[in-house]
Amino acid sequence: MNEYLLPK
């Protein structure tokens, strides 16, 4: 999974 798809 890509980090930019995760909530900050």
UniProtKB/Swiss-Prot annotation:
Predominant place of localization:
secreted
**Cofactors:** heme
Give the taxonomic lineage as stored in the record.
Eukaryota, Viridiplantae, Streptophyta, Embryophyta, Tracheophyta
Q: Where in the cell is it found?
A: Secreted, Cell wall
Q: Does the keyword Protein biosynthesis apply?
A: no
**Protein name as catalogued:** Cytochrome P450-like protein
User: What does the entry list under GO cellular component?
Assistant: extracellular region
Keyword Secreted in the entry? The reply is yes
Q: Which UniProt keywords apply?
A: Cell wall, Secreted
Q: Which domain of life is it from?
A: Eukaryota
